[in-house]
Amino acid sequence: ENLNDTGHPIATHESSYKAARQYSNQELDGEMPFQLHIIDGNGEPPEFWANLDLHAFEFGHSYMTAIFKAPNDPLSQAYFASLAAAKGEDTASEILSVSRHNTIIYPSCSPHTSFQQWRVIRPISVDRTLVEIFTFELEGAPPELLQRTFIYSNVVNSPSSIVMTDDVHVYAECQRGLTTQGGDWVSQHRNAGQDKSFEGDDGGLIGEGSSELPIRNQFSAWKRYMLDERNQEFRSTGS
């Protein structure tokens, strides 16, 4: 549920992005290879996250705009050339102009289009969840592109990665917290009431990067499903 939450990376992933920066400075003279670059991104300051856009749609779906700049490395250039050869330069540019980080197809799917990855989140019980990761090879693309996908999946999303262990720890603490005798309410109030209707082709609602719009949107959809409120009007308030 923290996929499109921009409040957690700089705190939750501090240990991993600081380790990446330390290794880069001490061992690589400041060079930041791909494996470290994708870890380092979590250390961007709060202003960076606030400037992202969060889009939410009816029935709990949402996505976050990209946190990495459009790559211009030799592999990305070779991929564009192969795509342009198959689809034409205009269509290739249009395809690659769709730049998103995390996408949530509520309740259980999360495609990551930049790295050809698809995650399926399967609840097993109230405190057990199975996460399956699928990677895709793009027909006609340079074979090194698939290797980059594997690297991203292993470094960022693998259960044994130094990034995912941060998230798993947070999930475990949330589960523990919900069993305590504390308050019954879980706050989702960041930027509540400030989200706006999006007038672009996508429709839906849009909030700035610090908004908790995506999680409010998910809980609103969950409530609709539990109460069978199929005809309830789409609202930004959540529940």
Briefly describe each language-model feature range.
Residues 1-239:
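Rieske [2Fe-2S] iron-sulfur-binding subdomain
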